[in-house]
Amino acid sequence: MTHPFATKQIPFFLTASAPCPYLPGRFERKVFTRIDIGEGPALNDALTHAGFRRSQGVLYRPACEACDACKSVRIDAEAFEWKRRWRKIAARNRDLHVSIDAQTATMEQFDLLSRYLDSRHGDGDMAGMSFGEYVMMVEEGAQRTHVTEYRDSDGVLRAAALTDVLKDGLSLIYSYFDPEWERRSPGAYMILDAVRQAELAGLPFVYLGYWVRQSRKMSYKAQYQPLQVLTPSGWQPHAELAYHDMEDEEDDFD
């Protein structure tokens, strides 16, 4: 399958069926295309707006035959509701130094990621990732991309978020943090800080990837309101749709 984009045809491919990582007993398929140098930033913008996610040099979205549980979501940063819980988390982490200067992978980031994966996702797909694979994760297919770093008062890296800058917002690709700092809710703080960064940059949205209402791992994203959900009719306010959501603790972005 191809689709016209600018002056060229963009080829799309379909993966084979595989077990769903979010809903037991279900199977997933994905449609994907590769990002080429040159038109990459514009393609990333257009397809993210259409519900795709970037992973290294690939843009993909679910194309499951009998399930549409994965919903692309984005926060309306301009109207974000800073409820008491969010204000407390922001205050708890206000001593952190935030930098958006890192555009390449570092061993310091990788060491932190390895500790995070060992603590929270020891049996996941990313377990045992090598430094070379991490470099590919950060740098391959990068489209106006940076690693937002969060350091304590001693300069120690405590959390990081791989972030794409789009025309209409920030897309949070993956986040990780020091497991010993979990009581500070660093995952939630990185989302809140992305909202702050988007506001400062005049960008209306923060893209969080896929929200899966039936998955306790992925349902937490509905806590960040106002949230918009991509539907067959376009982006719609989550609050106006007939969902009854579970709330769960923070996680990384998918």
From Swiss-Prot:
Keywords: Acyltransferase, Cytoplasm, Transferase. Belongs to the R-transferase family. Bpt subfamily. It is an enzyme of class 2 (transferase). HAMAP family: Bpt. GO terms for molecular function: arginyl-tRNA--protein transferase activity; leucyl-tRNA--protein transferase activity. Its EC number is 2.3.2.29. The keyword Acyltransferase applies. One of its GO terms (biological process) is ubiquitin-dependent protein catabolic process via the N-end rule pathway. It comes from Maricaulis maris (strain MCS10) (Caulobacter maris). The gene is bpt. The lineage of its organism: Bacteria, Pseudomonadati, Pseudomonadota, Alphaproteobacteria, Maricaulales. This is Aspartate/glutamate leucyltransferase.
